[in-house]
Amino acid sequence: MSEPILQINHLSKTFGSHEVLRDIDFSVNPGDVTSIIGASGSGKSTLLRCINLLETPSSGEILYHGKNIDHIKCGASAYRSHVGMVFQSFNLFNNMSALKNCMIGQTKVLKKSKAEAKASALHYLEKVGMAPYINAKPSQLSGGQKQRVAIARALA
């Protein structure tokens, strides 16, 4: 079996005296589909924020392809280009079309060419069923459609 893409070992996170995550262990292997489920306030978002370098765990380790992500803090943008996250509030730019929302991070953060970013954005918008809405602004989309644009943006 190949090395896990993501390995979480004994991860804990506290905010003051409030323990949000305690001794979390799991791995994600190539081809896996993984769901994180739990009650409201159970730490799902905190776990994802730790994985995406938006929070620092209190203890434990997160390995990405066998490397501890603590050692790649300076390369957070490069790491995040492989580990996407869709927020509960989709954080789409209201003045931009669905297509532009999916391109902006690629051109500004990842420094891809506009042509490359557009091709990637179109590919993922197609995959999530949003190709007919590439020119629509977020105000013209339903909540579910906005979510699909946010997913395409995370994948692109």
Model feature map: region roles:
Residues 3-156:
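ABC family nucleotide-binding domain
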